[in-house]
């Protein structure tokens, strides 16, 4: 990834990654040109059975199959159980594209 280039993030559990997530990725990539996918640590429960590594592998396989280049078009970063986003600057654009009605 070009660390100077405009980037957007996708934050979630992605348990599992599915077509609506891929659609969200396509939209984010179209709008910003590169995406950091932040995988919330949520391993080992009945609701969240997949490990970060399993989810990351599946996401990479899916997006590469779609024609995106890992480490150039997108990267994956494990993160703790983030429950809120805070920003002290108005220079950051906060957008919300919901896919909850499909889950």
Please annotate each region the language model reported.
Residues 1-103:
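Nucleotidyltransferase catalytic core that binds NTPs
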């Amino acid at each position: 990834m070009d660390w100077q280039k405009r980037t957007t993030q996708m934050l979630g559990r992605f348990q599992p990654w599915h077509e609506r997530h891929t659609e969200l990725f396509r939209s984010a990539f179209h709008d910003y040109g590169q995406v950091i996918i932040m995988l919330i640590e949520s391993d080992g429960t009945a609701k969240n059975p997949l490990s970060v590594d399993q989810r990351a592998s599946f996401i990479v396989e899916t997006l590469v199959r779609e024609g995106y280049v890992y480490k150039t078009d997108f990267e994956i970063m494990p993160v703790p159980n983030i429950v809120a986003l805070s920003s002290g600057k108005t220079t950051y654009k906060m957008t919300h594209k919901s896919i909850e009605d499909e889950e």
